[in-house]
């Protein structure tokens, strides 16, 4: 009985454990054991990055749930048939940064729902016709940074929904004809390959829907074969984004942009393109360059048009040249790329040192040592590899790079050091890499980069530093380096200065800064303004704030500057570095002024700034016009005033108003005796209009008094006329008659009447200073009878005008020995106009 108990007890425990564990994989899969999972919008996101996975069978996913799967930076080397058969609900799969060198036929079977596939940063060399079988709904394919040299003609023929294809940074020299005939591409990236030409027939004619085409960093041969591409680019719609085609050869055009070259300069006699048809009706139009071609493992069929018997189209099959296979070090695999190059595959071979590869192969072109256990790279390890163009040391355990380890690699263009244990970078590590264009340092533990680290690489274009531990960068670290793509994401940056770091990236096309713990404070204002200056598509993703708490997960670009740093703009007393630079250096002052102007344009939208400047300009124009009108008006008034003054100067009567309200003072001046009359000037006729104080009623009283004192008046009048005859106002040749006296004027018929009227008007005439004058001088008048005084009425009318009209604050100049004479400049418009009218 005990024996049966001992036998059944383990079996019972095993059954219970299976029953308790069997439901878990069906519900959670690898989420509880191997991977990290989260659900978002009903879709599972399964993160299996850096888990050491080398077989897809290690992955199990929840059933009947759509999901995104990330297998970044694992140890996958090959994709076998039906490897993804258990992942039928996958929407996207990321296989980047592995060591995948081959994909078997049917590897993607069962992925009918897959929309995105990432196989970038692997070791693929060829894309076969059936590589992507089973991906009928694929829309996005990323295969950059591999070693792809060959793409077979029907590799993409089944991808009828593919819109985005990324093939940059491979070694593609040519594309087969009609490769995209049935592919509705809108975005195509072919940067960093070996392309020399792209013909219209068989290629350009099938990408008419393209919106974004990147063609930089290829070996374009600017000759007549490139004329079709130039014509096609010129006819593209303006909304399309087309990268620059920069000539690589011939030497006279190296570095020139194709779009700026004239057709006659690189193709004096345009060729006549003929279409050659094969029996299947396809056009053979794209061929690789004969000067730098790679030979595939298959035979190449060359089609020639016959010069005789045009009815026959013979096919000449030329076998590929059999090159002697050079020595290949064990345990590596070698492949001949061309008569002058060798590709050496040594990945995943447990190699600890390059000294194990002895003797070194002859004339190696590419050396792949990814996925080994190399700890140290010695200076002597690569001495015999001076012909290398690509060196892959990714996913090793390299901690030390001796100074000068790459000294002999003067031809090296691509260097992969990703996935190692490097902690510090310095200048000595990269000595000798004068031709290097691509440097991959991601997924290390780099904490410090010393100044001048990248100076030995004057041609460096692509730099990957993502997924490290960087917090700061030294000043001028990118100065003089023609970088076009920089990846700094997933580091420890809280802020990144623009001055002396980011503003040295003069050739920048793309930069990655996301997934850093950005502190959205005053230190990030400059970075925000710099981001606003970047062109569309330069930033691959948005920068999100981590601190302070109220700005967590806020997009930096969308924040206002005053929210990042309150009071920064409105605090003029805050000392800044530019304040001191302006005083000390004129050169830096100009840079500071441009910086201030650029800051202004960043803070204010350009459209608003232009509108404001336009308003200011219009305001200035109107102000200037107003000033001109005012000046002209003043000039006209001045001229008019001069004319009036001339008229006053020509008149014997001068009245001048006092400028003040006080009593006027009397000024005595000398006046020429008869200058006016010697110039034959006619004395004005002054009509005395009866004022209210001397009207008809007053005249009746005067007549009554005249009856009593008539005789005295006659004597007084004669005396006045006699003295007037000797007055300076009259010339010696003038004769007057009293009989010419007009009835319109009021005459003096009684001396007492004259004095009485003067006394009544004395208060009003005090400002004129005439009363005292009359009291002193009229008593001395001796009347004479029978004096002929023909102009006496003019003088009398003038006297009556001055005495009986309303006083105007007039300055009257008088002399002691003469009959009173008026010498004042007239400024009283109503009286003066009346005088002029009567004179006329």
From Swiss-Prot:
<protein>
    <recommendedName>
        <fullName>SLIT and NTRK-like protein 6</fullName>
    </recommendedName>
</protein>
<dbReference type="GO" id="GO:0007409">
    <property type="term" value="P:axonogenesis"/>
</dbReference>
<feature type="repeat" description="LRR 1">
    <location>
        <begin position="89"/>
        <end position="110"/>
    </location>
</feature>
<dbReference type="GO" id="GO:0090102">
    <property type="term" value="P:cochlea development"/>
</dbReference>
<dbReference type="GO" id="GO:0002093">
    <property type="term" value="P:auditory receptor cell morphogenesis"/>
</dbReference>
<dbReference type="GO" id="GO:0051965">
    <property type="term" value="P:positive regulation of synapse assembly"/>
</dbReference>
<keyword id="KW-0433">Leucine-rich repeat</keyword>
<feature type="compositionally biased region" description="Polar residues">
    <location>
        <begin position="727"/>
        <end position="736"/>
    </location>
</feature>
<dbReference type="GO" id="GO:0042472">
    <property type="term" value="P:inner ear morphogenesis"/>
</dbReference>
<feature type="repeat" description="LRR 2">
    <location>
        <begin position="113"/>
        <end position="134"/>
    </location>
</feature>
<dbReference type="GO" id="GO:0009986">
    <property type="term" value="C:cell surface"/>
</dbReference>
<keyword id="KW-0844">Vision</keyword>
<keyword id="KW-0732">Signal</keyword>
<keyword id="KW-1133">Transmembrane helix</keyword>
<dbReference type="GO" id="GO:0008344">
    <property type="term" value="P:adult locomotory behavior"/>
</dbReference>
<feature type="region of interest" description="Disordered">
    <location>
        <begin position="717"/>
        <end position="736"/>
    </location>
</feature>
<feature type="repeat" description="LRR 3">
    <location>
        <begin position="137"/>
        <end position="158"/>
    </location>
</feature>
<dbReference type="GO" id="GO:0048812">
    <property type="term" value="P:neuron projection morphogenesis"/>
</dbReference>
<dbReference type="Pfam" id="PF13855">
    <property type="entry name" value="LRR_8"/>
</dbReference>
<feature type="repeat" description="LRR 5">
    <location>
        <begin position="184"/>
        <end position="205"/>
    </location>
</feature>
<feature type="signal peptide">
    <location>
        <begin position="1"/>
        <end position="18"/>
    </location>
</feature>
<dbReference type="GO" id="GO:0007605">
    <property type="term" value="P:sensory perception of sound"/>
</dbReference>
<dbReference type="GO" id="GO:0002088">
    <property type="term" value="P:lens development in camera-type eye"/>
</dbReference>
<feature type="domain" description="LRRCT 2">
    <location>
        <begin position="516"/>
        <end position="567"/>
    </location>
</feature>
<keyword id="KW-0716">Sensory transduction</keyword>
<dbReference type="GO" id="GO:0021562">
    <property type="term" value="P:vestibulocochlear nerve development"/>
</dbReference>
<feature type="repeat" description="LRR 9">
    <location>
        <begin position="435"/>
        <end position="456"/>
    </location>
</feature>
<dbReference type="InterPro" id="IPR003591">
    <property type="entry name" value="Leu-rich_rpt_typical-subtyp"/>
</dbReference>
<keyword id="KW-0812">Transmembrane</keyword>
<dbReference type="InterPro" id="IPR001611">
    <property type="entry name" value="Leu-rich_rpt"/>
</dbReference>
<feature type="domain" description="LRRNT 2">
    <location>
        <begin position="319"/>
        <end position="360"/>
    </location>
</feature>
<keyword id="KW-1009">Hearing</keyword>
<feature type="repeat" description="LRR 6">
    <location>
        <begin position="363"/>
        <end position="384"/>
    </location>
</feature>
<dbReference type="GO" id="GO:0071944">
    <property type="term" value="C:cell periphery"/>
</dbReference>
<feature type="transmembrane region" description="Helical">
    <location>
        <begin position="610"/>
        <end position="630"/>
    </location>
</feature>
<dbReference type="GO" id="GO:0007601">
    <property type="term" value="P:visual perception"/>
</dbReference>
<dbReference type="GO" id="GO:0007416">
    <property type="term" value="P:synapse assembly"/>
</dbReference>
<feature type="compositionally biased region" description="Basic and acidic residues">
    <location>
        <begin position="717"/>
        <end position="726"/>
    </location>
</feature>
<feature type="domain" description="LRRCT 1">
    <location>
        <begin position="218"/>
        <end position="269"/>
    </location>
</feature>
<dbReference type="GO" id="GO:0060384">
    <property type="term" value="P:innervation"/>
</dbReference>
<dbReference type="GO" id="GO:0005886">
    <property type="term" value="C:plasma membrane"/>
</dbReference>
<dbReference type="GO" id="GO:0060007">
    <property type="term" value="P:linear vestibuloocular reflex"/>
</dbReference>
């Amino acid at each position: 009985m005990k024996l049966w108990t001992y036998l059944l007890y383990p079996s019972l425990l095993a059954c219970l454990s299976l029953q308790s564990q069997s439901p878990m994989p069906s519900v959670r899969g690898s989420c509880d054991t191997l991977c990290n999972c989260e659900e978002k919008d009903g879709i599972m996101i399964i993160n299996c990055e850096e888990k050491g996975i080398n077989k897809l069978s290690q992955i199990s996913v929840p059933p009947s749930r759509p999901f995104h799967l990330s297998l970044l930076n694992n140890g996958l080397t090959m994709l076998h048939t039906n490897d993804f058969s258990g992942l039928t609900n996958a929407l996207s799969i990321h296989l980047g940064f592995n060591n995948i060198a081959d994909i078997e036929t049917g590897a993607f079977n069962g992925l009918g729902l897959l929309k995105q596939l990432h196989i970038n940063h692997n070791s693929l060399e060829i894309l076969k016709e059936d590589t992507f079988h089973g991906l009928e709904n694929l829309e996005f394919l990323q295969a950059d940074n591999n070693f792809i040299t060959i793409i077979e003609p029907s590799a993409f023929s089944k991808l009828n929904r593919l819109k985005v294809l990324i093939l940059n940074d491979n070694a593609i020299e040519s594309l087969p004809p009609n490769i995209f005939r049935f592919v509705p591409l809108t975005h195509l990236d072919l940067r960093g390959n070996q392309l020399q030409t792209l013909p219209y027939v068989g290629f350009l004619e099938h990408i008419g829907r393209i919106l974004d085409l990147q063609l930089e960093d290829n070996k374009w041969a600017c000759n007549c074969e490139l004329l079709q591409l130039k014509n096609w680019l010129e006819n593209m719609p303006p909304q399309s984004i087309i990268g620059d085609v920069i000539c690589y050869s011939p030497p006279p055009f190296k570095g020139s942009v194709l779009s700026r070259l004239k057709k006659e300069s690189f193709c004096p006699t345009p060729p006549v393109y003929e279409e050659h048809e094969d029996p299947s009706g396809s056009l053979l139009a794209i061929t690789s360059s004969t000067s730098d071609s790679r030979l595939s493992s298959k035979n190449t069929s060359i089609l020639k048009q016959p010069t005789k018997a045009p009815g026959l189209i013979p096919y000449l099959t030329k076998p590929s040249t059999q090159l002697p296979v050079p020595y290949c070090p064990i345990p590596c695999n070698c492949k001949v790329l061309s008569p002058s190059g060798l590709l050496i595959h040594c990945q995943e071979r447990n190699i600890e040192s390059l000294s194990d590869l002895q003797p070194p192969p002859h004339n190696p072109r590419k050396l792949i040592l990814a996925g080994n256990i190399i700890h140290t790279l010695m200076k002597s390890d690569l001495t015999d590899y001076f012909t290398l163009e690509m060196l892959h040391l990714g996913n090793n355990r390299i901690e030390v790079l001796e100074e000068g380890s790459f000294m002999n690699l003067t031809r090296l263009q691509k260097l992969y050091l990703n996935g190692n244990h490097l902690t510090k970078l310095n200048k000595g590590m990269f000595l000798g890499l004068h031709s290097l264009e691509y440097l991959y340092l991601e997924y290390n533990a780099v904490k410090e980069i010393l100044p001048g680290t990248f100076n030995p690489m004057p041609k460096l274009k692509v730099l990957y530093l993502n997924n490290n531990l960087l917090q700061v960068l030294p000043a001028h670290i990118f100065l003089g380096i023609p970088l076009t793509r920089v990846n700094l994401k997933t580091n420890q940056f809280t802020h990144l200065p623009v001055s002396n770091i980011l503003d040295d990236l003069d050739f920048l096309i793309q930069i990655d800064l996301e997934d850093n713990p950005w502190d959205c404070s005053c230190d990030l204002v400059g970075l925000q303004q710099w981001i606003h200056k970047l062109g569309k598509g330069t930033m691959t993703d948005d920068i999100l704030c981590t601190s302070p708490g109220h700005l967590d997960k806020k997009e930096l670009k969308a924040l206002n500057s005053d929210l990042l740093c309150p009071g920064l703009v409105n605090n003029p007393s805050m000392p800044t570095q530019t304040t001191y630079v302006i005083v000390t250096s004129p050169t830096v002052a100009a840079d500071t002024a441009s910086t201030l102007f650029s800051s202004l344009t960043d803070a204010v939208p350009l459209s608003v700034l232009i509108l404001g400047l336009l308003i200011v300009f219009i305001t200035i124009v109107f102000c200037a016009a107003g000033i001109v009108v005012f000046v002209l008006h003043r000039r006209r008034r001045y001229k008019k005033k001069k004319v009036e003054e001339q008229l006053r100067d020509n008149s014997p009567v001068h009245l001048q108003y006092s400028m003040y309200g006080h009593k006027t003072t009397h000024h005595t001046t000398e006046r020429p005796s008869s200058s006016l009359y010697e110039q034959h000037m006619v004395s004005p006729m002054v009509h005395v209009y009866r004022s209210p104080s001397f009207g008809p009623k007053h005249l009746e009283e005067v007549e009554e008094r005249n009856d009593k004192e008539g005789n005295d008046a006659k004597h007084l009048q004669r005396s006045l006329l006699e003295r007037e005859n000797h007055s300076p106002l009259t010339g010696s040749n003038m004769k007057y008659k009293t009989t010419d006296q007009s009835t319109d004027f009021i005459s003096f018929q009684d001396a007492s009447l004259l004095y009485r009227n003067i006394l009544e008007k004395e208060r009003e005439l005090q400002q004129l200073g005439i009363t005292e004058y009359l009291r002193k001088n009229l008593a001395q008048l001796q009347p004479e009878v029978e004096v002929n005084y023909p102009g006496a009425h003019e003088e009398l009318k003038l006297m009556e005008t001055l005495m009986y009209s309303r006083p105007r604050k007039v300055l009257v100049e008088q002399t002691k020995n003469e009959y009173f004479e008026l010498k004042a400049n007239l400024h009283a418009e109503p009286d003066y106009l009346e005088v002029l009218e009567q004179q006329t």
